């Protein structure tokens, strides 16, 4: 577990934010102003006991009284009980469990929500969407996540599944998604999808500057973007096709929710203008007639710690120390 420290004034309320990801778990003490007091990270737990032990190791580092624990986790979360109702993939061991029971929060209030929603909370409270009341956040990484704020309220839906934008159907005959559907956005634009599509190009012996690693590992999405920027035709072909699906999905989302701003986050956002320019071009040409305005598109402001900050933000919102 690796800590990082910054300063926070002694009169600030402080909460613990925990972000449970597929490959890493992060935690931080966060002040009500959004200041990161101290942060921790390690590879993701693979058992309930490992999750419990990590959180309690963090709690023992507290230097001040804590207002509570906020949890951001993939999957569908019952916010009233902290139950993980659906969670396929590497964190499946949490499915059906109450996070409050797994973590045993030592008398502290515990609040939980989907990790894309906690990322959205951090942007609305302290980041690129500060002060906005209608926001869509799209996270692009190994998978595709999403969260939506409408008139100051986070959309959760009847079963807590609202905002799972990565599971919009874009291709009725597309590949099978982990959700059981076919042709989801996540199967067309995600690190998994881009790297798999690039592998198919390698198997067809298409001209390319990249190759498989010594152990047969795929070129990373970052490397594919870099190769495309340097003129690699295979990389450019893969990304052009993936971006067609992404821009189509973005245009649909903007027509449905009519946000003040669209926030793009996740590891793929590091591609910068290669990602943002085609999205902005598509939005400018395909939404202006109906929406009558240009919708700002911005990258996530709290890069690297939005998940833990937003998880702590759950505590501050629930205890009415902050409001959206």
Kindly label every feature range from the protein language model.
Residues 2-53, 83-86, 160:
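Short glycine-rich, Thr/Ser-proximal phosphate-binding strand/loop in the N-terminal lobe
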Residues 25, 105-108, 112-116, 170-205:
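Glycine-rich phosphate-binding loop plus the immediately following alpha-helix
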Residues 30, 113-124, 270-324:
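Glycine-rich phosphate-binding/hydrolytic loop that grips phosphoryl groups
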Residues 35-65, 230-233, 237:
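N-terminal phosphate-binding loop and adjacent alpha-helix
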Residues 43-56, 68-69, 76-136, 273-286:
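Glycine-rich phosphate-binding loop and adjoining helix at the ATP-binding site
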Residues 53-69, 108-110, 128, 208, ...:
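Phosphate/pyrophosphate-binding loops at sites that engage ATP/ADP/AMP, CoA/4′-phosphopantetheine
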Residues 132-189:
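Glycine-rich phosphate-binding loop of actin/hexokinase-like ATP-binding domains
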Residues 186-263, 296:
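A mobile "lid/hinge" subdomain adjacent to the ATP/sugar-phosphate binding pocket shared
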């Amino acid at each position: 577990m690796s800590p990082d420290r910054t300063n926070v004034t002694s009169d600030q309320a402080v909460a613990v934010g925990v972000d449970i990801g597929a490959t890493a778990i992060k935690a931080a003490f966060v002040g009500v102003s959004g200041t990161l007091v101290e942060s921790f990270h390690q590879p993701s737990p693979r058992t309930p006991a490992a999750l419990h032990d990590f959180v309690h190791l963090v709690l023992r580092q507290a230097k001040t009284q804590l207002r509570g624990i906020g949890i951001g986790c993939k999957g569908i979360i019952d916010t009233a009980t902290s139950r993980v109702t659906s969670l396929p993939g590497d964190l499946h061991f949490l499915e059906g469990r109450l996070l409050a029971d797994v973590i045993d929060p030592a008398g502290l209030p515990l609040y939980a929500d989907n990790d894309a929603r906690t990322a959205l909370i951090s942007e609305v409270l302290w980041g690129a969407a500060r002060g906005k009341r209608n926001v869509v956040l799209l996270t692009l990484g190994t998978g595709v996540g999403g969260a939506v704020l409408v008139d100051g309220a986070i959309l959760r839906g009847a079963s807590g599944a609202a905002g799972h934008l990565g599971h919009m159907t874009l291709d009725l005959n597309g590949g099978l998604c982990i959700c059981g559907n076919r042709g989801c956005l996540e199967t067309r634009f995600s690190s998994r999808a881009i790297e798999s599509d690039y592998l198919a190009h390698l198997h067809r012996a298409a001209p390319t500057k990249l190759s498989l690693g010594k152990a047969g590992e795929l070129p990373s999405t970052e490397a594919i973007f870099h190769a495309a920027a340097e003129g690699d035709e295979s990389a450019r072909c893969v990304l052009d096709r993936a971006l067609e699906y992404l821009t189509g999905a973005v245009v649909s989302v903007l027509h449905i929710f009519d946000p003040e701003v669209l926030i793009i986050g996740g590891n793929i956002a590091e591609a910068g203008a290669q990602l943002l320019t085609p999205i902005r071009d598509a939005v400018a040409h395909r939404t202006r007639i109906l929406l009558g305005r240009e919708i700002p598109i911005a990258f996530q402001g709290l890069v690297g710690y939005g998940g833990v900050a937003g998880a702590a933000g759950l505590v501050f919102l629930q205890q009415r120390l902050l409001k959206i």
